[in-house]
Every structure is written in C-alpha cells, then in structure tokens.
Amino acid sequence: MNKRGKLTINLIRNEESTMNKNGKKLGIFSFLLFLLTALFTLASGNASAEETTPAVSVTGKFADTITIVNVSNNEGGDLNWDLEQWATFRINATYDLAGKNVKAGDQTTVTVPEALIITSSSFEIRDINTNEIIAHATVDAENKKLTLTYTDYVEKHSDTNGSFFFYARIDFKKHPQQGEIPVVVTVNGVTKVAGKVTFKGIGDGNPRTLTKTSWVNNTDYKTVSYTISVNRNRQNIKEVTLEDHLKFTSASYVKDSIKVIKGKFAYVDGEWQFSDRVDVTDQHKITIAEDGQSFVIDLGDITEADQYRISYDVRLNYQPVDGELLKNDATLKGKGVVIKEITNASAVQIAGGAGIGYVFTINVHKVDDANQPIKGAKFKVVREANKQVIGEYETDENGNITVNALLKDKYILTETEAPAGYVIKDADTVVNVEDFGTD
C-alpha cells in the first residue's frame, strides 16, 4: 500500500528564527522549508574604513557625508581569494547627512586608486520606501571617479542616511604584476582605507582551444553579448563543429547577430588582441534549433593557422536583477579529439543603493506520517522568471535538501520521483518572493 502524508511549509528568517508562517496542507509528505535571508550590511566587507583625517563639515558645494567604506565580493560577502584579470568586486559605502546642512546640488566625490577601474555605469540612490531620488551617482571611469549629486530630497527630509555600492576591477595595464593592492579611496580629498585586494597578475593569457566571454549591456541589462574564441593555442583539428546552448529559456538569440570572424590572436600587455579580421560568416553553415535555444556552426577542418572569433547577442524577455548569473554552454567537437566544453556565466552587475545577491537558501526536510525522515525523494528547482533549472536534488538520510545561492525570486519545487512505497500527489510547491521576507 502506498503511503500518504502531509506537506507543511514553515517560512523562517534566520535573523528571527522564532517567526513562522502557518503551515498549509498540500498533500503527501511533510516538508519544512526554511527560507534563509542573509541581507549583507555594508559592515560585512574585508575591512572597515579608517579615516586618515577627522570628519570635515560641508564647505561650499562639497558634502562630506561618507562615514564607512569597505570592499567585498560581488555578492556582498568577504573577498578572501585572489582576483583574476577581469574579476570584479564591490566597493561599499555608507553615508549620513545628519548635521551636514546638505542642499540640492551639493556633491560628494569618491575617487578610486590608480590601480583600479570603476566598471559600473551611473546610477541613482533612492529612498527604499518612496522610491524618490536622493542623489544621482555619476561615474567618470576615465578619471576613476564617482560623484554623488544630491537632489532637493535632502532639503525636505532630516537626518538622511543610507548606503550604496559600485563595482570595480584591477587596472591591469597600470598594475600588471601579482600582489596585494591597498584600496584607498579619496572622498572630497580625504583618504579613507577601504581594505585590500590581491591580484593574480596578468600571466600568459592561458591560451586554449575554446574560450568564452560575455558581458551584460549596461543600458537596460536585457542584452547579453558573447564572444567565443577558437584555437588560441594553434591546434590542427578535423571536422570541427561549435555548439552553443542557452541554459535559461526566457531569452532568445538576436536575429542575424551571429558572426564568424577569422583572424589572428596575440596576447599583448595583458589582453588578447584579434587582428587581420575577415568576416567569413557566409562561408560556414549555421543551424539554429527549432526552439531557438541552441545553434551549431560548422567550421570544417582547422589548422594551427586558423583562428576564429564567434560573436552573438542574446535578448532577455524579463528584467534581470543585480547578482544574477546567466549561464550557457559552448562545446567544440572534432574528429579524434576530446570534446572541449565550457560553461559561461554572465553576471548582471547593477550598482545602486541596495543590491540583491546570491544570498538566499531553501532547506527542505521530508518526513513521513510518523515524523521520520525519508531518504531518496527527488526534486527539481526552477526559477520562474527565466525557467532556468537551478538543480536537481535528492533527500539524504536525514530527509534534507539544501539549495544555496538563490536570488530573492519566485521558485517552483517539483518532486520528480518518490521513494519506494510512496506516491506523488501534488508535485509542485511554489515559493514566492514575499515568502523570503523583507529583511
């Protein structure tokens, strides 16, 4: 006889573990879903700021409002690893306008050291409750400077305070060597120590048969551009095909954006350069799958003298959020060679006064009617926004599954296979955005 049970969902924040939501009966087993929010505060970086001079009051149009500056990884946590050449990190800051007599048009400037580059675009700092603009943050990448220009919001509200962050990376042309880099920012001419980062150095570029890079358009964040570099290490391969497959479904390839360019690769001053370019797109067969989620390019036989760069764009049909990773695969196949497969994750990085990162967790606990753990139940977790499969999981001997690195978004938990002696009645369990809480 197949067993039946109950599905109980309790939503608990890790800051206040005594809070819960009334369980709802959905059918067959008992689950305990813990939605753990870990909203990073700006004090959780590698090092808090240390002022080299005392705080200064407002003088003219410059408002000295920054109280703390620190560095963190892209998700807001500790940056405890060495940075690669193009790797980014966050610079976080808190500000407090209390007692500063700040007026509309007053400014605060933040300048990063010569060894860094600001990679964020300009953004706005807003009131988290009313969405009113508190300040415009303008990025001057060439001069390594970010300027806050305050609006009349600051004259209509008292004791305004908050936080913001932006992304940066190592300027490897000015600092190519391996080693530790102090992150000392200048705020209105006053230096503040934000912490330090360690750079791996530019190295030899790691020439490979297949390399894939991507970046997100920083205008609307809905267009992702990809480049695939083929044969940087100068191999001879017969009957070469290149396959690309999107791992998120709420998106499609931009029509006519796929280009095949032939040229020559060279690693110069820390960057791969591609010269002597010739567009050979019309010389190669390109097949796009009926579902629009993959394509295949027939490159034919390649010699050590044949090097290619394939480029294309993908358009999302939803609005991504800061911290989101957009993954897709590329595979190179050839006669008598090992398949070269790479997975590329393009990170959405939107600077602002608040951020959402991969800091949420779903814990599933499965028990029978006697409240004993059940091993071997299989589940699939899908993010609703882009239909991306987060992963497939199986309960352990304690009846537990842990799904880490989630955005604060809607997810569908689908039971795909029940253990022996049990049946699936209601396969899907929905986790909504509001279930995670607002902390």
Task: Show where each model-derived region lies.
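Solvent-exposed loop/turn and edge beta-strand elements of beta-rich ligand-binding domains
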Residues: 4, 9-439
